[in-house]
Regions:
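Hydrophobic ligand-binding cavity/cleft-lining segments
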Residues: 12-72
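Intrinsic-disorder/low-complexity, polar/charged segments enriched in Ser/Thr/Lys/Arg/Asp/Glu/Gln
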Residues: 24-28, 77, 134
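Intrinsically disordered, low-complexity coil segments
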Residues: 17-20, 34-38, 86-104, 126-132, ...
């Protein structure tokens, strides 16, 4: 049976893990929110507000190759139509539906409702010493008949580079949050 796990611990506060089985690819990153005192400090409340904005599809958080439109919304759940590179990832060309659920003030779970199964979990991780980490985990089902790897999908769409890894995306989103905090927008 195929099971590959690769763990990287960047510091005692951060970790990156990738696990692959024949059917699943799981990437997880836990990135320290306030690694030093020289940059704007981000509070748990600001992180929570940012998770909500990201989950709603706020364009400041969404990569340029993703298009999203809210079609249903309640306090704890949002359903959006999603296009990648201006196109559907589904064989019939219809927009993929994405459901985002909020669990309390520190966890956001997003999954695609058709086509190859994909789930992302973003959240706030509190360490025993009070430090905050931004957590992002992605799970892809590779054995779905319509599955295409993210890099192959980007190449097919004509993108000049592959989409970010889970760790790169976590750091990208955290950088956006820090910028919004510095500008007083969170």
């Amino acid at each position: 049976s195929l099971l590959r796990t690769r763990s990287i611990v960047a510091s005692s506060k951060e970790s990156v893990e990738t696990t692959e089985t024949a059917a699943l690819e799981i990437q997880s990153a836990s990135v320290q929110v306030n690694p030093d005192r020289s940059s704007a400090q981000i509070s748990k409340k600001q992180l929570s507000s940012a998770l909500r904005a990201w989950g709603r599809g706020d364009e400041r958080f969404i990569p340029s190759f993703v298009g999203s439109k809210i079609i249903k919304e309640s306090n704890d759940e949002i359903v959006k139509e999603i296009l990648h590179y201006g196109k559907s990832s589904l064989p019939d060309g219809s927009p993929n539906l994405q459901r985002t659920t909020f669990r309390g003030d520190n966890l956001m779970i997003t999954e695609y409702l058709a086509g190859p199964w994909f789930m992302a979990i973003a959240g706030i991780e509190e360490k025993q010493d009070g430090e905050l980490c931004f957590l992002l985990t992605t799970v892809r089902h590779k054995q779905h008949p319509d599955y295409v790897s993210p890099s192959a999908a980007a190449k097919k769409a004509g993108a000049d580079k592959p989409p970010p890894t889970t760790e790169q995306n976590a750091r990208r989103v955290l950088g956006i949050i820090r910028g919004l905090v510095e500008e007083g927008q969170l």
